């Protein structure tokens, strides 16, 4: 629509420099910045190196990732270090399903979970840093998952055209059947949670595109789940906040909430 295009045309998308360390290799080869050397002890590095390229390789389970900002926080606390430091214990027991919650049984469109009243979307498959306890390691690690129809593939990311088409279709069927979908028993889809991964690693333009598309489709409440406030708080800058202000001005009827994750 015209109002959507006017909103999107004003979005600024600066580049952000998180100074990430990606993977264990920089720690193995001591190629991390000088101030980050020693984050893993020699014995910790040796224990992880032995597992490399074996079935118990911790990065086959989920890649290691760390921002400079979170390193500065973690270096002061052993407890916080455990959140992002890989250990051999992660792969002691690899039994079980990659989809223990059977989420794929409730995915009518790639990248969307619609099990309950609200919908949850995977809009990105990474975060600024990776918590080692992450319960979506199959998504972060890009693992193949068995679908309800028996096919096996990696979880796909949500795409705007497919999601918007599903919202319109679902809500039209609900409206035509007394407020309840005749097959699933679900009511009108009013609320969407943007998740992943962390939506805040996306550019402002991509976040804005999701927000406006969902608003135009009649979604009444949008939530964004993020740990970026802990990993890289500089992401919440003037350009991003200005975009949010303009979104509220353009779509005052839509509630927008941030679900901010911290460990403490």
In which residue ranges do the predicted regions lie?
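Flexible, acidic/Gly-rich N-terminal and inter-domain linker regions that tether
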Residues: 1-117
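Conserved, mostly hydrophobic/aromatic
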Residues: 70, 131, 224
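Residues in well-ordered beta-strands of folded domains
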Residues: 71, 122, 261
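Solvent-exposed, flexible loop/coil residues
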Residues: 84, 88, 235-236, 240
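Glycine-rich active-site/cofactor-binding loop and its immediate structural neighborhood
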Residues: 99-154
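Core AdoMet radical
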Residues: 136-239, 247-264
């Amino acid at each position: 629509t015209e109002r959507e295009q006017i909103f999107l045309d004003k979005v600024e998308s600066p580049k952000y420099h998180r100074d990430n360390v990606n993977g264990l290799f920089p720690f193995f080869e001591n190629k991390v910045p000088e101030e980050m050397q020693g984050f893993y002890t020699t014995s910790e590095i040796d224990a992880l190196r032995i597992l490399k390229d074996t079935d118990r390789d911790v990065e086959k389970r989920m890649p290691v990732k760390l921002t400079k900002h979170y390193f500065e926080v973690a270096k002061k606390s052993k407890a916080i270090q455990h959140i992002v430091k890989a250990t051999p214990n992660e792969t002691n027991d690899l039994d079980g399903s990659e989809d223990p919650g059977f989420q794929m049984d409730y995915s009518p469109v790639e990248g969307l979970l619609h099990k309950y009243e609200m919908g949850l979307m995977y809009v990105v498959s990474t975060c600024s840093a990776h918590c080692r306890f992450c319960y979506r390691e199959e998504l972060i690690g890009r693992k193949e998952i068995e679908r309800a129809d028996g096919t096996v593939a990696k979880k796909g990311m949500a795409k705007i055209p497919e999601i918007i088409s599903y919202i319109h279709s679902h809500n039209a069927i609900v409206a035509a059947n007394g407020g309840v979908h005749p097959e699933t028993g679900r009511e009108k889809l009013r609320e969407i949670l943007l998740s992943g991964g962390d939506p805040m690693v996306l550019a402002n333009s991509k976040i804005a595109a999701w927000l406006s598309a969902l608003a135009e489709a009649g979604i009444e409440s949008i939530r964004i789940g993020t740990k970026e406030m802990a990993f890289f708080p500089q992401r919440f800058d003037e350009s991003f906040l200005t975009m949010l202000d303009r979104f509220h001005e353009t779509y005052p009827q839509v509630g927008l909430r941030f679900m901010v994750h911290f460990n403490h």
